[in-house]
């Protein structure tokens, strides 16, 4: 059955740094990774070539499906964003702990000592509560019920309160402590 020879090659080979799965998903993307079909016309006439394969390729070019490499780019962005947010949370937590140490050590005679101390402790407690709620939110995400929505609302309010408290804390903290330790 030597009626003709069909060669199918990929523009990007698996050795080009991508995984084999993302390379073979080319027809779904419509992003330049379409299969090149070369037909030796000496062996096959145009009416003998299966039109199903060419019509599938043309339809896949028109579709807007995302490649797995496109999805991994979005997942990578989300992961990097989450890491950056986590690092910012840790920085805020350590800054508040350092401010608490500063208040206790050097600023215990300041006129705003009690207000600053209350706000630092309140901010630290709220940060811990928000962190614990984030853990539970992840577990509740599977169910998407009313408690998930309530937890999400409480988290937004908690983050807002932490922000307001830290702005007020920056305004009320003074360095006019009379104690020299």
Curated annotation (Swiss-Prot):
GO terms for cellular component: membrane. Pfam families: Ninjurin (PF04923). Residues 1-72 are annotated as: Disordered. Residues 94-110 are annotated as: Helix alpha2. Residues 12-26 have a biased composition (Polar residues). The chain crosses the membrane at residues 116-136, 154-174. Residues 137-153 are cytoplasmic. Residues 80-91 are annotated as: Helix alpha1. InterPro entries: Ninjurin. GO terms for biological process: cell adhesion; cytolysis; killing of cells of another organism; tissue regeneration. Keywords: Cell adhesion, Cytolysis, Membrane, Transmembrane, Transmembrane helix. Residues 1-115, 175-181 are extracellular. Disulfide bonds: none annotated. Residues 1-10, 33-49 have a biased composition (Basic and acidic residues). It is a multi-pass membrane protein. Effector of non-apoptotic necrotic cell death that mediates plasma membrane rupture (cytolysis): oligomerizes in response to death stimuli and promotes plasma membrane rupture by introducing hydrophilic faces of 2 alpha helices into the hydrophobic membrane, leading to release intracellular molecules that propagate the inflammatory response. Also acts as a homophilic transmembrane adhesion molecule that promotes cell adhesion by mediating homophilic interactions via its extracellular region. Composed of 4 alpha helices: 2 hydrophobic transmembrane regions (alpha3 and alpha4) and 2 alpha helices (alpha1 and alpha2). Alpha1 and alpha2 feature one hydrophobic side and a hydrophilic side. In normal conditions, NijB is inactivated and alpha1 and alpha2 helices are not inserted into the membrane. Following NijB activation, alpha1 and alpha2 helices insert into the membrane and drive NijB oligomerization via interactions between alpha3 and alpha4 and the hydrophobic face of alpha1 from an adjacent subunit. PANTHER family: NINJURIN-B, NINJURIN-RELATED. Belongs to the ninjurin family. This is Ninjurin-B. The lineage of its organism: Eukaryota, Metazoa, Ecdysozoa, Arthropoda, Hexapoda.
């Amino acid at each position: 059955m030597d009626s003709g020879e069909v060669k199918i090659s990929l523009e990007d080979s698996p050795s080009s740094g991508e995984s084999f799965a993302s390379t073979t998903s080319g027809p779904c993307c419509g992003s330049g990774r379409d299969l090149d079909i070369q037909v030796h016309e000496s062996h096959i006439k145009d009416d003998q070539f299966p039109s199903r394969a060419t019509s599938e390729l043309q339809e896949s070019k028109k579709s807007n499906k995302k490649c797995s490499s496109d999805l991994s780019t979005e997942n990578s962005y989300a992961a990097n964003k989450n890491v950056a947010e986590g690092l910012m949370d840790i920085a805020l937590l350590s800054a508040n702990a350092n401010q608490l140490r500063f208040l206790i050590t050097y600023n215990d005679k300041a006129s705003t000592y009690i207000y600053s101390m209350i706000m630092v402790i309140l901010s630290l407690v709220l940060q811990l509560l928000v962190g614990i709620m984030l853990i539970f939110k992840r577990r509740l995400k599977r169910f998407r019920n009313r408690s998930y929505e309530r937890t999400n609302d409480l988290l937004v309010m908690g983050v807002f309160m932490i922000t307001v408290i830290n702005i007020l804390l920056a305004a009320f903290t003074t360095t006019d402590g009379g104690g020299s330790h």
